[in-house]
Amino acid sequence: MPTQSEKAEIFKSLHEARDAFFIPNPWDGGSAVTLEKAGFKALATTSAGFARSLGREDGEISLDEKLAHCQLLSSVTSIPITVDFENGFADDPGEVGANIARLSETGVVGGSVEDWSRTVMYDFTHAVERVAAAAEASARLPIPFMLTARAEGLLRKTGDLDDIINRLKAFEAAGADVLYAPGLANLEGVATVLGEVSKPVNVLTPFLPGISREAFAELGVARLSVGAALAGHVTKALGEAAENLLTTGIF
């Protein structure tokens, strides 16, 4: 079993390749084990998928529940894991930094902090201060913990691409290791973002269906995630199987 430090170095090298590696999103221990066995080199948690596995909605998970979930996934897998850490479970920059330190203790090697509070977008200055605090906390850790900064404006329909790019550039300057703007819906937008920043970029692929990994790699995208889509596929399949069982009486 690789150590946390070894996993962190592996995770860092995956991003440095800028070769659009897929990082699927498990929602529980079983799905994490399945995805590792399938051959993926790293995993990313999904806040929505985890919440729904507990019968709740996205954003209804406590910090302690999130940390326990991350500890579980780390304990049943041997590959790097990064975490959808939502808003860092705090509004205050200092508290976000403290929570990043707690997150690292679960065995994961990265995490994301977004500029959405679950009710409103943080203003530009506050959003940057939060990323800076998270980056400072990450830098103090004994491993190369990779901090992803998320600009949520497209996903929440509160900002245009120019606003997103301004935030991503500021997050990069504040110390983020990876940049992420969920909601980019075409390759032109992805290319525009890549042309404005220098840090590795994550793309959420369900917004760009039918586009190959190779096409993203040619642009220089570092990482591809699927969010809660895999969890959604499993839930849909379960519903269809259940309906068939009730309708036909045959399994």
Where do the PLM segments sit?
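Alpha/beta enzyme core
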Residues: P2-V83, N87-A228, G232-E240
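C-terminal segments
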Residues: G239-I250
